[in-house]
Curated annotation (Swiss-Prot):
It holds the Pfam family UPF0270. Belongs to the UPF0270 family. InterPro entries: UPF0270 (IPR010648), YehU-like_sf (IPR036685). The gene is yheU. This is UPF0270 protein YheU.
Length: 72
């Protein structure tokens, strides 16, 4: 089930994004990016619709995923 990110408090959204970024592991790109940069990137992806917040009833967890990978 999709969760409208706009309906979350800014603090809750920030915490969800930080948790997601920290779970994603180490970035082995050419340039190391700060946590703040990664959080800003995910927030931008949510705002422009590239990513969505998804509630899993089975696992009772929230995840962030590319919109193209979400299947209802």
């Amino acid at each position: 089930m999709l969760i409208p990110w706009q309906e979350l408090s800014p603090e809750t959204l920030e915490n969800l994004i930080e948790s997601f970024v920290l779970r994603e592991g180490t970035d082995y790109g050419e340039h190391e990016r700060t946590l703040e940069q990664k959080v800003a990137d995910v927030k931008r992806q949510l705002q422009c619709g590239e990513a969505v917040l998804v509630w899993s009833e089975l696992h009772e967890t929230v995840n962030i995923m590319p919109r193209s990978q979400f299947r209802e």
